[in-house]
Amino acid sequence: MTSNRSDVRRRAALAAGRIGNEESVPELTKLLQKDINVDVRSMAAFAMGESESEAGTNALLAVINSSVPGEVRARAIEALGKIAAALPKEQETRARELGAAVLEALKFESGLRSAPNRLTILLGLTAALRAKPANAGPVIARFLGYADPRIRIDAANTLARLRLKDGNEQLRKLLTADVDPIVRANAARVLGATEEKPAFDSLLDRALNDNDARVRVSAIRALGSLKDARAADSLLKRGVVLAQSDLRERSAETNEVLEIANTLGRLLQAKEDKNTLDWLRKLRETFDHMAPEVEIAFARISPEAYLAEFGNEASAKRKVQEILLLNWRAGSCLAQGFGEIGTLPESVKNRTVHMGAAETLLRAMLNYRNSGLNINTLVAVHSEYAIPDVLRALAAFKSKDLGEVLRSQLSESDVIIRATAAELLGDLPSEANTRALQEALPRAMKDELNDAALAILDSLGKQKTPAANEIIKSALDSRDHLLRRKAVTVLKANGAGDFSSRIGTVQTRNTVADYKRALARIGMSVQAVVDTTKGPFTVELLPGEAPLNVDNFVQLANRGYFNGFTFHRVVPNFVVQDGDPRGDGNGGPGYQIRCEINEVPYDRSAVGMALSGKDTGGSQWFVTHSPQPHLDGGYTVFGHVVAGMEVVDRIVRGDVIRSIVIIQSTNRSRKR
């Protein structure tokens, strides 16, 4: 940070922020306050936000209240939002002060009659989303009237995530009249999140008639939040029309149909509506039981009819076991449907009977290995992949022997089953469960994947007992820095001591050759042509912003790692996600890579590394359908889709990557 070269100082500041060590804050503060280069000062502010340390907040507050270049001020506001969100409960007063400062900065920008700073507004809106300052609604709502559609988009996004009603009158107008579809979609999100009853007619109109699928889906979802059953008939008619065509060839309609099913399940809970049930039966066949939205909606509307689909008890047990043995994805979806019955309100007729029947079927699924069924297939079925969802569903019934059932799963070979069992045991504190978690931890710490070990540490932490804390301390000696970090975090939260010095350094898996190869791409054009069952799209990778993440992706693609993987997660108007060898969202390449957080924003078409926590990336990646500013500074952006984004928009859950071809050239990639 003391180099004579400004680019080196800037990169050093970024590195300090990525590491996140509080000890770097004094040096970052010096750069923020005194460096002669604006880019260095801006990066210092960004890095201080990534450190999430309160130690630098006075300097950041001084910056936003002084005359500094716009980018420096914007990054300081962004940093205050990140720090406010990360402060522990005992520093709640300070967090409120930081949130108030963010809001005051936004108020100042909204009052400028000429030349407001766009970056300050956008980063300030996201900072407000994170800091959650009191009385933020009226200030944020001011930005709904700006000419810049991206500002309107982000203002609505912040109001939606904070569930603030202050802009609802204007949002009702934007819902029907704004020319930008993402503004309309986000307007629908706010009106749904705040349960704006007067918006019913406008939302129903957009759900049925908007020319953009993202708006229709957001409006359908919002109608579910309004809980107004008047929407059911119109939505069902729309769903019937859409389902008459081959949904496998009509992606936008598929996502729309699934959202309609989900919303009807919310609007018609326990209504036993025959027409809706008939439609859902057809959808179950269309999706071959592999749409959880359909299974859950069916179970909500008529638990009796849903259970009847499987026959009497003996044949039903055999049927669900057979489905699980043939197709784990279908088994997972059935489990989610049965789990919904476990959450039925007291008012549902024959609730106890239905819950007993559903629980019996879940236990049969859990016991699938003893079914006596012999299924011959040419490919590995991996029925065990459905068991985590079976366990979560079973937990909803709160059976007396749930602890015993979960403890028995701690000896399973599948690490995700053990992780799920450990996680659920965290809500069942008892001496027997503590002993079981203690016995399971040594094995989990030797796993290739650390999911089970992390879950065990979390569950032990919830018990907040001296005995549990002593067990957690054993992870301080782990070779995995993520386990050491988790142990330190849990022990500190439990008041059992500050062992931060035990985190130590990371044992990197990268060699000198790896670093040289990754750095050699900086300045080159590196593209990934992703061929899917819906067509190809091209990603411009960003080696200058995230060299190691790009190198990891390139190495995996070059060896054909992604070929045949399914897009296991598709959330309309949010993301599509792939890269999981298991296909259930829990898999990876058997190692983890460090985050390379950067200033590239999550605009539409951004390509990011999926995580389950800091530095947990591996092979799962996602593409954003629309701007997602809440992801900025939390997930590594390592590319952008530069061609074929219309293909990404057509992708639905279950679509497949055929191949990824990497194209490198010495031509410098164009700046975005």
Language-model regions: role of each:
Residues S6-D7, E22, N37-D39, E54, ...:
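Alpha-helix N-cap/helix-start positions at coil->helix boundaries
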Residues R11, E27, M43, A59, ...:
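Alpha-solenoid helical repeat scaffolds
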Residues V8, S24, V40, G56, ...:
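Stable alpha-helical elements in mature extracytoplasmic
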Residues T2-L31, D35-E50, A62, E423-L424, ...:
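Alpha-helical, heptad-rich or low-complexity scaffold/stalk segments
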